[in-house]
Each structure stands twice: as structure tokens, then as C-alpha cells.
């Protein structure tokens, strides 16, 4: 996020500010290992290969974000991409906060900051994510995100449990959030 975007985000009441001591930033390839570790240690996310997190930091940096701590190390991350058939939709793939930094509002600040950047720079109008019914933290995070931005949420099962090859995988419920209004002064 540039200084101008941070000023814009700070002026909007619907943007949760990044907690003191942290900085919102675009991920770099060098962050891939730390992001993989945060995802692994979350115990809630489906862990991808370490290689995929390196690729994510290279190929999807514009639609992802990290919160850096005082030592510039990633303390939290959110990964996303634009849907190929709906390029005005940001799909949030994963979001997690390192255990040492939980309870400070980093996930909400990352989600707000990334969405504000994607609306301004990429013309995003809606956000999608999938969440399993048993993931209370993510369900609360995205419900409060929609409420903070005064946008509707539509929920429907995207992938039923029977589609997954492993036993015991919960269904993935699609959360369609938006539409968001393009803020005044944005590039779109």
C-alpha cells in the first residue's frame, strides 16, 4: 500500500487500521517460507506446498498482502487472485495470523487493506472466499468484514464434502461479498 493509499484508507471509516508496530505490504518471494510456516501453524488452513507459496508471492503479489512486524518479518498474510471469468472479483484464497500476533485485528486490517487496494487499483467490485462451516474464526472475520463495509453476503455451498477425495472434509461454502462502491478519487 502506498502512502497515498494508506492516507485514503485511514480517512475511510470502513477500513480497519493496521495495528501499531505492523506495516501492510505486498509480499515478496523471500516471504514465501514464512507464509508457508504461518499457514502450517494455523491448524485451520489446507496447507499447500512450500513451492506454491513462493509462486504465490511472485505471481499473485498484486492481489495478496502481508503484515510485517517491527523486524519486517511477515506476521500475517492474505492471498488472493482475480477470478479469470470475473476480473472484478477478488477471490481470497487464504488468510492467517502467526500465533504470537493473534487477537490484534491483523486479519481484519489485512482484508480491509487488500480490498481497498484492489478496488482502487484493479477495479474490484466484489470479494469471494470459501469457508468450511466449522471454521468459526473465518466465518466471523468475513461476516464482520461485510458488516463493516455495509455490503451484502450471499452464502451457498460451492464444493460439497462428497467432492473431496479425503474423508471428513467439510463442504466449502462460498461467501459472495459485495458489491463495493468505487471510492471517490480511485483510479477506476
Protein language model regions, located:
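Conserved GNAT acetyl-CoA-binding A-motif
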Residues: 118-133
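Active-site rim helix/loop that mediates acceptor-substrate recognition in acyltransferases
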Residues: 40-70, 74
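Conserved active-site alpha-helix within GNAT-family acetyltransferase domains
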Residues: 108, 133-155
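Short amphipathic alpha-helix that is part of the acyltransferase structural core
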Residues: 10-48
Amino acid at each position: 500500500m502506498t502512502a497515498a493509499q494508506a492516507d485514503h484508507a485511514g480517512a475511510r471509516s470502513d477500513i480497519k487500521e493496521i495495528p501499531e508496530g505492523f506495516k501492510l505490504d505486498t509480499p515478496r518471494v523471500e516471504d514465501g517460507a514464512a507464509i508457508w510456516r504461518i499457514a502450517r501453524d494455523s491448524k485451520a488452513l489446507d496447507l499447500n506446498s512450500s513451492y506454491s507459496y513462493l509462486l504465490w508471492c511472485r505471481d499473485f503479489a498484486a492481489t495478496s498482502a502481508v503484515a510485517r512486524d517491527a523486524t519486517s518479518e511477515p506476521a500475517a498474510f492474505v492471498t488472493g487472485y482475480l477470478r479469470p471469468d470475473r476480473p472484478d472479483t477478488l477471490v481470497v484464497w487464504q488468510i492467517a495470523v502467526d500465533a504470537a500476533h493473534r487477537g490484534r485485528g491483523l486479519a481484519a486490517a489485512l482484508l480491509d487493506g487488500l480490498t481497498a487496494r484492489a478496488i482502487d487499483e484493479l477495479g474490484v467490485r466484489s470479494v469471494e472466499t470459501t469457508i468450511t462451516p466449522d471454521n468459526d474464526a473465518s466465518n466471523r472475520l468475513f461476516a464482520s468484514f461485510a458488516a463493516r463495509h455495509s455490503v451484502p453476503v450471499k452464502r451457498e455451498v460451492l464444493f460439497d464434502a462428497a467432492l473431496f477425495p479425503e474423508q471428513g472434509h467439510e463442504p466449502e461454502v462460498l461467501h459472495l461479498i459485495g458489491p463495493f462502491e468505487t471510492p471517490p478519487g480511485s483510479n477506476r
